[in-house]
Amino acid sequence: MNWREIAVTVSSVGEEAVADLFYQLGCPGVSVEDPELLQSYVESGNWDYHDFGEIALTGTSVVKGYICEDHELQPKLRQLDEGLKELLQRFPEWVLQVKGLTVQEEDWATSWKAYFKPVRIGRHFLIKPSWEEVTPLPEDIILELDPGMAFGTGTHATTSLCLETLEETVKPDMRIFDLGTGSGILAIAAAKLGAQVEAIDLDSVAVKVAQENVELNQVADRISVRQGDLGTVLQGQADLVVANIIADVILMLIPDLKRIMKEDGEFLASGIIGHRSSDVEAGLGEHGLEVLEKKEDSGWVLLRARWQRASL
């Protein structure tokens, strides 16, 4: 099967909006290549410039989406074009360049490997690609991943914020719901901290990849991975609900927290671009939640919230 890879070069503040356009098209794979992250790897001596070409020098980000080259390709391309034009009208400095090329599915599934290297997050997490060898420290918690076509290697600020907060928050035998699990990295991290996790995703590719990563990390006894939305898949209530998605989707999820989160539970919301944080905070407040903690990294925000006592 052939896929059309659309690469949109965009200022970092526009990452979320462009990624959302791809999600609206039903793209099964969306990636963000962050030049600041790649530059940090160069400066630390982990990589050399030739590992990834020009992107580290651009000072922008590249958002890539993949659209199947079938009878729906042209309508989807027109829809994407209209969406990008609308963004350009509202924020002329955001979208800088758009490129497209045809890729084979097997190429799409493996081309990103050049960008994925072992990385330490928080106090103890060591994220290791399945094809890389590392020498761990005794206290390391190894998260071994093969993300394939699913989003989530742990290197993006949104995911690293979640991992750091999980390390501070998770207690043994907690029940956790991971909404939009992607590669399964957050579910696996929580399971290795002792939690029982129910991970869901609407994308069948993500569910397949997440299940493979769960088995790779030998935590299948602590994680269930299912396809579907929280209204049809999740039963009961969790001690902790995690959503590393985008602001608009988080806002749609908030009304359901009353059903799926315990009275003394907490909600971790990440994937929020900085200028949308106030919208999410307002949405939480409108539904009886208070923000306990706000973390920021590279223009992205994580919010940790719980029920206000008066709302129970």
UniProtKB/Swiss-Prot annotation:
An annotated GO cellular component: cytoplasm
Gene3D superfamilies, A to Z: Vaccinia Virus protein VP39 (3.40.50.150)
Reactions catalysed: L-lysyl-[protein] + 3 S-adenosyl-L-methionine = N(6),N(6),N(6)-trimethyl-L-lysyl-[protein] + 3 S-adenosyl-L-homocysteine + 3 H(+)
Subcellular location(s) of the protein: Cytoplasm
List of residues binding S-adenosyl-L-methionine: T159, G180, D201, N244
Highest taxon of the lineage: Bacteria
Pfam families: PrmA (PF06325)
EC number of this enzyme: 2.1.1.-
A GO biological process held by the record: methylation
Keywords noted in UniProt: Cytoplasm, Methyltransferase, S-adenosyl-L-methionine, Transferase
One GO MF term: protein-lysine N-methyltransferase activity
Family: Belongs to the methyltransferase superfamily. PrmA family.
The protein's name in its UniProt record: Ribosomal protein L11 methyltransferase
Organism of this sequence: Desulfitobacterium hafniense (strain DSM 10664 / DCB-2)
